[in-house]
């Protein structure tokens, strides 16, 4: 018995230092993860960048907030670890980036923000009226279509100055998805997409660009992600819900209500997400212009330029963190945390990420070497001491 105990203790002495050495090696290895795309998610993504680096000082995130379309393009060129978008991949994009998985990361709202001197937030607008404004058919702030929805509001006899996105934008995709659902005329004349032929208005880059135009231009109006509207102290409309029963303020609660009605059934991680939409969902408290935000990543990350197996594991670790612990940072920035069922589905998607056709292990090649050395050591000690290491049948 004493002989067996000493042998086991000796084996532990062999394994523990090796494990410590491995952990030390892992901690000292630095990685820069790369992502690009959505400006909609940038305030939250940047918070994730800072908070994750506080926890893992050897991991840095370089995220380019360049618009969903540009981010997806970099993914198809295989020059970034992941792309972020407020719009799901369309069939043509999925064909250009075969083998990707879709990971919902958060949920956000899109405001109709305006700059009317002397008028606070809360102008009431319906979907059809919003469509007519952005088509250029309603051109004045005191138009009867707006005035009749807002009795007692001192609307100016001033021209509406429209600001819209000029870049390929997931925010545009979600906004025009909404307009296409509430206005047959919009659907036919303009349609839905990351880039559309805007009938009127001035284009700007990113949510920040549109917010900047509206904020600095009296009588301007544009569509701006909720976090940007709050951060820039912008005024925004209350939009009529899908039921037509109320005008709903964009808040975390009202966006969450809209998402809850839609996100009960989602495609497989590598399936067709192109028809997924959460805009204009039923419910008296549902804000109708809301969207999921997504991360796209290749199942086989070995095809990414400069990728390694260990770095692939760090990408998986980061993605797992943002859909679980990272969700605590969503609400303070006016994003809606993922429902638990959606986070569970994301876990499945992340588990499918591989490197070179093999599942990315929890530990890299160094760990495999450490384990091999430990096993050889155990066998050697066992042979010398006579300790039995196989189960007795």
Annotate each PLM feature.
Residues 23-359:
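Flexible loop/hinge segments at secondary-structure junctions
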């Amino acid at each position: 018995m004493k002989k067996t105990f000493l042998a086991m203790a000796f084996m532990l002495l062999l394994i523990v230092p090796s494990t410590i050495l491995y952990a030390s090696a892992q901690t000292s290895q630095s990685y820069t993860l790369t992502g690009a795309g959505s400006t909609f998610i940038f305030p939250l993504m940047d918070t994730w960048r800072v908070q994750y680096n506080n926890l893992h000082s050897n991991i840095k995130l370089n995220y380019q907030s360049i618009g969903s379309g540009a981010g997806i393009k970099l993914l198809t060129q295989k020059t970034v670890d992941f792309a972020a978008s407020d719009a799901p991949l369309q069939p043509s994009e999925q064909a250009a980036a075969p083998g990707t998985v879709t990971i919902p990361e958060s949920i956000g709202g899109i405001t109709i923000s305006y700059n009317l001197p002397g008028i606070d937030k809360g102008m009431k607008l319906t979907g059809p009226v919003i469509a007519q404004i952005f088509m250029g058919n309603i051109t004045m702030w005191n138009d009867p279509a707006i005035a009749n929805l807002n009795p007692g509001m001192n609307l100016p006899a001033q021209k509406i100055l429209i600001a819209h996105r000029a870049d390929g934008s997931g925010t545009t995709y979600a906004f025009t998805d909404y307009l296409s659902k509430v206005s047959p005329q919009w659907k036919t004349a303009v349609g839905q997409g990351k880039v559309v032929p805007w009938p009127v208005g001035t284009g700007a880059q990113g949510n920040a660009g549109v917010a900047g135009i509206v904020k600095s231009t009296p009588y301007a109006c544009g569509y701006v992600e909720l976090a940007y509207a709050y951060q820039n102290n912008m005024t925004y409309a209350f939009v009529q819900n899908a039921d037509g029963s109320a005008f709903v303020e964009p808040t975390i609660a009202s966006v969450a209500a809209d998402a809850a009605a839609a996100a009960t059934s989602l495609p497989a991680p590598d399936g067709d997400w192109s028809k997924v939409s959460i805009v204009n969902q039923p419910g008296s408290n549902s804000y109708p212009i809301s969207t999921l935000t997504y991360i796209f990543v290749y199942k086989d990350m070995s095809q990414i330029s400069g990728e390694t197996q260990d770095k692939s594991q760090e990408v998986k670790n980061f993605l797992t963190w943002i859909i679980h612990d990272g969700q605590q940072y969503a609400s303070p920035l006016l994003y809606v945390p993922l429902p638990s069922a959606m986070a569970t589905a994301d876990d499945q998607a992340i588990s499918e990420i591989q490197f070179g056709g093999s599942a990315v292990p929890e530990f890299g090649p160094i760990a495999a070497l450490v384990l091999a050395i430990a096993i050889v050591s155990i066998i050697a000690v066992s042979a010398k001491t006579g300790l039995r290491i196989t189960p007795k049948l």
